[in-house]
Design a protein with these regions (language model features):
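Enzymes that bind and transform nitrogen-containing heteroaromatic metabolites
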Residues: 2-186
C-alpha cells in the first residue's frame, strides 16, 4: 500500500478569519478571484475530502475530482456506492463518497486510487481539527491583505503558532494583496 499526502487547502483574511456561518466571507470580492482559480488549478485531478457542512453547501460534486465527504453520523457500511467503488477501484466525479473520518478517506485513497495526494478542502472546522490532530502532511494557505469580518454569530479563526508546520514556499499575487504560503510538517 502506498502512502499519500493529505494536503489542507484554505484561505484566511489578514486577521486569520477562515469562515463565517459556513461560508467564505470573501467569495464576492473581485480581488479574491485569483484564489478560486488557484484552488481549482491545484485540486483538479486529485481526490478531495470535505466535511459535511461544506458538502451541504455544494449543489453537486466538483468536476474532475473524486469527492469524499466526512460524516461521522453515517455508517460506511451503508454506502453502496463506496463499497462498489472500492471493490472495482472505479470512482467517478459525479458522486459523493461518504466516509466516517479523514483516516478512512486516506485509507481508501491509498488502497483504491492511483493518487499520490488528496486535498482536504474544508470547511474551516474540519481543516482546523485536522491541523490540531496532526492529520495533515502539508497545508496551502492563502492570506488576503484585507479584513472581512462583519457582525456574525459564528466566525472561525486559524492560528498556526502552536503547530509544527514550517513554511516551504511563499508567493504573492495581485500586487501583494494575496499571499500563498505552503507548509509542511516540521
Amino acid at each position: 500500500m502506498k502512502n499519500i499526502d493529505i494536503i489542507g487547502i484554505m484561505a484566511q483574511d489578514k486577521d486569520g478569519l477562515v469562515g463565517i456561518n459556513n461560508d467564505l466571507p470573501w467569495k464576492d470580492d473581485p480581488e479574491t478571484k485569483w484564489d478560486m482559480r488557484h484552488f481549482k488549478e491545484t485540486t483538479t485531478g486529485y481526490p478531495i475530502i470535505m466535511g459535511y457542512k461544506t458538502f451541504v453547501t455544494f449543489k453537486k460534486p466538483l468536476k474532475n475530482r473524486i469527492n469524499f465527504v466526512i460524516d461521522s453520523h453515517d455508517s460506511l457500511s451503508e454506502q453502496e456506492n463506496i463499497k462498489r467503488a472500492i471493490e472495482t477501484k472505479e470512482f467517478n466525479d459525479t458522486e459523493f463518497y461518504t466516509v466516517d473520518s479523514l483516516k478512512t478517506a486516506r485509507e481508501i485513497i491509498e488502497q483504491a486510487l492511483d493518487a499520490d495526494k488528496a486535498y482536504l478542502i474544508g470547511g474551516a472546522t474540519t481543516l482546523i481539527r485536522a491541523i490540531i490532530n496532526n492529520s495533515l502532511d502539508k497545508l496551502i494557505l492563502t492570506t488576503f491583505d484585507k479584513s472581512y469580518f462583519k457582525d456574525s454569530e459564528d466566525p472561525v479563526y486559524l492560528n498556526l503558532d502552536s503547530t509544527d508546520f514550517v513554511i516551504t514556499d511563499c508567493r504573492c499575487r495581485n500586487n501583494g494583496k494575496i499571499e500563498y504560503l505552503s507548509f509542511k510538517k516540521g
